[in-house]
From Swiss-Prot:
Stored PANTHER family: LEUCINE RICH REPEAT FAMILY PROTEIN, EXPRESSED, RECEPTOR-LIKE PROTEIN KINASE 2 ISOFORM X2
Protein name stated in the entry: LRR receptor-like serine/threonine-protein kinase RGI3
Superkingdom in the source lineage: Eukaryota
Organism of origin: Arabidopsis thaliana
Major localization listed first in the record, in broad terms: membrane
Glycosylation sites: 40, 104, 163, 356, 431, 452, 604, 651, 697
Amino acid sequence: MPPNIYRLSFFSSLLCFFFIPCFSLDQQGQALLSWKSQLNISGDAFSSWHVADTSPCNWVGVKCNRRGEVSEIQLKGMDLQGSLPVTSLRSLKSLTSLTLSSLNLTGVIPKEIGDFTELELLDLSDNSLSGDIPVEIFRLKKLKTLSLNTNNLEGHIPMEIGNLSGLVELMLFDNKLSGEIPRSIGELKNLQVLRAGGNKNLRGELPWEIGNCENLVMLGLAETSLSGKLPASIGNLKRVQTIAIYTSLLSGPIPDEIGYCTELQNLYLYQNSISGSIPTTIGGLKKLQSLLLWQNNLVGKIPTELGNCPELWLIDFSENLLTGTIPRSFGKLENLQELQLSVNQISGTIPEELTNCTKLTHLEIDNNLITGEIPSLMSNLRSLTMFFAWQNKLTGNIPQSLSQCRELQAIDLSYNSLSGSIPKEIFGLRNLTKLLLLSNDLSGFIPPDIGNCTNLYRLRLNGNRLAGSIPSEIGNLKNLNFVDISENRLVGSIPPAISGCESLEFLDLHTNSLSGSLLGTTLPKSLKFIDFSDNALSSTLPPGIGLLTELTKLNLAKNRLSGEIPREISTCRSLQLLNLGENDFSGEIPDELGQIPSLAISLNLSCNRFVGEIPSRFSDLKNLGVLDVSHNQLTGNLNVLTDLQNLVSLNISYNDFSGDLPNTPFFRRLPLSDLASNRGLYISNAISTRPDPTTRNSSVVRLTILILVVVTAVLVLMAVYTLVRARAAGKQLLGEEIDSWEVTLYQKLDFSIDDIVKNLTSANVIGTGSSGVVYRITIPSGESLAVKKMWSKEESGAFNSEIKTLGSIRHRNIVRLLGWCSNRNLKLLFYDYLPNGSLSSRLHGAGKGGCVDWEARYDVVLGVAHALAYLHHDCLPTIIHGDVKAMNVLLGPHFEPYLADFGLARTISGYPNTGIDLAKPTNRPPMAGSYGYMAPEHASMQRITEKSDVYSYGVVLLEVLTGKHPLDPDLPGGAHLVKWVRDHLAEKKDPSRLLDPRLDGRTDSIMHEMLQTLAVAFLCVSNKANERPLMKDVVAMLTEIRHIDVGRSETEKIKAGGCGSKEPQQFMSNEKIINSHGSSNCSFAFSDDSV
């Protein structure tokens, strides 16, 4: 190569070398790539970010200003799995907008975020950021939008937030923030949106200064622990459109100044403890669209002025204490779509003017005192989908015009005094899924037109005076799942066409006058519950019964069925209860009955004509609790029954059994009435009474006395300690400033804080518990209150739980919370004073003597069962009590039970048809409850469910039956009550020996009840939660125990040979029993609570 050419080539290469930096990525791009390198990126989200580019301005998610400086970064919806890039991006001095949302970022927000002084928008929402909000953020004077919502941020909202004078939007919702809303919030004059809801530990009052935020459009503080009154300054928010502070702890009245919020469209204050009346000034809000005030403690009348809000489409005042009538002015609300006034004390009639609301879709006025007739002009409501008016005092006919509401999906008019027939036109409603008319005075026939209602899912017509036959057209209802037409005057046969109801699971036709054969009737295979009892059905039981493999309960008692029991019944593998009593069955009892392993509740074959011996396979019915084969012609011995370890009730009377009665404690303690009229049966003298307690060994007596002395001494020392502590606390209280108390009353009570404080002395202590000490205090009106003072001023969890739970539920067997008050040092709860103490004190304490007889004990445990069933099955979401024990069952003036102490109560987020899976794993809960009553899953830290309450209730049942505390020191070897009972039954000892000696001398029928209740208790205390019954099933079993042969005297039973008449019931009384449903944070969708 010539020298000149060589030199030219060299200098060209050298020139290119020195000019390479001019075409490389600038410092901003390198900073972005540095952050990118720290992320765990999947996919091609950053495929446009090339190192070969000279500038990042064309990269996805990056924008630059005119000078080529990065001004905006916007990245959303990627799984980056890294930390915030603040350190890496320090060079981006011109950054005005930083959006890093839904990127799965972790770690804390770095303090260096405050260095980006040009930022106007900072959005770090929907990540997994933790730690406190750094105060350095509030150095960003130009910030207009701050979105930190949906993270795991903790700590307080810094007072320095007031420095952001230009802030327009502040989004802090769905974090773990605590403390109070700082008063400096009032410095944000330009703020339009404030959302900080979903922070459960955000507490204190809404500061008065919030009224300074006059540009506010949206105020969202829902699902927090904000308490106290809404400040009157809220009336300064002239531009606010939505106020959402629901599911919190607000108290006091709604300020009249709310009427100055003239732009308000949505007011959501439900699920609080707001009291007073609904302000009439709300009627001046011409733009108001949604008004949700349900589940508070509002009183007084519904303001007629609300009829002046022309845009209103949703009103919900349910679960309050409202009185008066439904305002006629509501008829002016042409846009009204939903009116929900359930569970109040509203009286008067349904105003006809309401039918002018032609857009109405939901009309829910159930659980009130509404009288009169249903307006015939209901036909105007062509958009109506739900009409609930159950548990009122409505009279007259169901208007035929209701059938013109073509969109109706659910009608519930139960528990009224409606008469006349069911309009056949109702069944022309093709969208109707639920028709509930139970417990009225309806008559006439079920029209054949029912077959047109093809979407019907639930039908309840029970407790009326309906006559005629069941129309065969019912077979057209392919979606029908639940049918209850019991306690009417129906005649004729069960239509074979019912086999067409292929989705049917529950069929109850008991107490009618149905007749005819079952042979031609093929029942749907989907059935789980059948009750045809107390009718006049004849013929044999068809072999097809074995096709019902899902069946759990079959009751055919009190009919005229004959022939043999088909052996195919053994294929009903899920059967738990079988009642064929009081029929005309004959032949031998099939051996196949012993092949049904699930048969655990009851097997009743009494009052038939069975012959032969008890099948040998009956020895396999290990879980059976009740067996009744009385009033038959059975022979042989009873040895096959000796292995039934769970058997607590057996009636073999009026047969021809022979041989020796098995020599086991259970058989020795059977009442003679359950063995009577078996001529060949040899009954030894050992079947008489318990051993005389005076024959006990004297050393045992001395040991017992010693234990009692020691226990008494311990109790005295504990009492002294409690009284001293109470006196010291009382002295401290007297020094408190009266004006520092926050007070909320749910009932009208006339007293001052001083009236309470000065009486919190040791002389007034009536009890202590895990969460506090309880005093009896008489207020100036002469009324006595029970006042609970929480133990620890720092521990507010139990206090908040009790307010949250008891403040939102009402049930006849749950203690009533009258109000509460608190200050910095103390928290007090006010309850009705119940004069008879607790169930525990009556069973074990110095006050024992009342509530000792079985009848009173039964009423107590049934009442508690109703309370728990209400919490578990009527409340939405389900409420777990968490500390069911005899000490927490209080007794009223007539020993009526009240479940108390909800300091450990919690809700569970699972409910049928919500799409929430209860089986999904959750964080294991901490230990809770009381030792001796806790279910086994507490000790193993398994998931706590409502079945844990069932176990605790079972322990209470055993305590009531045996008279022994769960940790009674007299139990052998220091055993727990459940283990002692379980061992006793496993050893085949006489179950009646388990019963409280104070219950001795009761009649055979009462003894039978007690032993059946023992069987229920044994089911409840199963070690496996999934084997325990639901509380609604416990209620059903206990009710069934008491209702067997109710109303018939012993003399009548003996005259009838122990079996009832086979004649069908022709008439039933017009008098109806109406269950009192409590009000709560529960679904009041329907009046029925059947399985």
